[in-house]
Amino acid sequence: MENRWQVMIVWQVDRMRINTWKSLVKYHMYVSKKANRWFYRHHYDSHHPKISSEVHIPLGEARLVVTTYWGLHTGEKEWHLGQGVSIEWRKRRYSTQVDPGLADQLIHMYYFDCFAESAIRKAILGHIVSPSCEYQAGHNKVGSLQYLALAALIAPKKIKPPLPSVRKLTEDRWNKPQKTKGRRGSHTMNGH
């Protein structure tokens, strides 16, 4: 019998970003209690040698599983030192992979406060509006004009430490264009 392969999308992530993610998840599970229904599985509880950790996030009947890997083949860049993340949505026997933006939206929908529909009406009438959105990572596009007006009216609370964002975990911060200071950049680099 021939081998059967299953291909998964694994986002290459540097080790420090994975450590930050794990730390934020544990903080909000055990200290702030905002993620107290989440389940953290350590590497020694897994039967797969490449799995570093798993975070199971219940979403109603379904759940989101964020798996971190180690010991993978390195990527094109030297900082891709064999670390990666996969994000999976599971319900009973069905599972599918999701991208970080959708994962953040699902987490936002189930776990964190945001403006209610009545908040817009209350703000127009001059009433105090609360709560504002605690999990900004769950909004991946520009909101309605009413939502933007509310967001400008009520400054979001700064939560220390920030809530764990899957998109932030998987973003490619290395390949973003560098901004230079001033109009012409550094004088020594320009030869002036």
UniProtKB/Swiss-Prot annotation:
Any Gene Ontology biological process: viral life cycle
List of residues that carry Phosphothreonine: T96, T188
Motif BC-box-like motif: where in chain: 144-153
Region feature Multimerization, mapped onto this chain: 151-164
Major subcellular site: host cell
Annotated segments matching region Interaction with host APOBEC3G: 40-44
GO cellular component terms attached to this protein's record: host cell cytoplasm; host cell plasma membrane; membrane; virion component
Biased composition (Basic residues): 176-186
Modification sites for Phosphoserine: S144, S165
Region of interest (Disordered), ranges: 165-192
GO molecular function: metal ion binding; RNA binding
Region span, RNA-binding: 75-114
Superkingdom of source: Viruses
Spans annotated as Interaction with host APOBEC3F and APOBEC3G: 54-72
Region (Interaction with host APOBEC3F): 14-17, 74-79
Subcellular location: Host cytoplasm; Host cell membrane; Virion
Pfam entry (one): Vif
InterPro entries (alphabetical): Vif
Keyword Phosphoprotein appears in the UniProt entry: yes
HAMAP family: HIV_VIF
Function, in words: Counteracts the innate antiviral activity of host APOBEC3F and APOBEC3G by promoting their ubiquitination and degradation. Acts as a substrate recognition component of an E3 ubiquitin-protein ligase complex: mechanistically, Vif hijacks a host cullin-5-RING E3 ubiquitin-protein ligase complex (ECS complex) and the transcription coactivator CBFB/CBF-beta to form an active E3 ubiquitin-protein ligase complex that targets APOBEC3G and APOBEC3F for polyubiquitination, leading to their degradation by the proteasome.
Subunit and interaction comment: Homomultimer; in vitro and presumably in vivo. Interacts with viral RNA and Pr55Gag precursor; these interactions mediate Vif incorporation into the virion. Interacts with the viral reverse transcriptase. Forms cullin-5-RING E3 ubiquitin-protein ligase complex (ECS complex) by interacting with host CUL5, RBX2, elongin BC complex (ELOB and ELOC) and CBFB/CBF-beta. Within the ECS complex, Vif interacts directly with host CUL5, ELOC and APOBEC (APOBEC3F and APOBEC3G) substrates.
Record's miscellaneous remark: Vif-defective viruses show catastrophic failure in reverse transcription due to APOBEC-induced mutations that initiate a DNA base repair pathway and compromise the structural integrity of the ssDNA. In the absence of Vif, the virion is morphologically abnormal. HIV-1 lineages are divided in three main groups, M (for Major), O (for Outlier), and N (for New, or Non-M, Non-O). The vast majority of strains found worldwide belong to the group M. Group O seems to be endemic to and largely confined to Cameroon and neighboring countries in West Central Africa, where these viruses represent a small minority of HIV-1 strains. The group N is represented by a limited number of isolates from Cameroonian persons. The group M is further subdivided in 9 clades or subtypes (A to D, F to H, J and K).
Protein name in UniProt: Virion infectivity factor
Gene responsible for this protein: vif
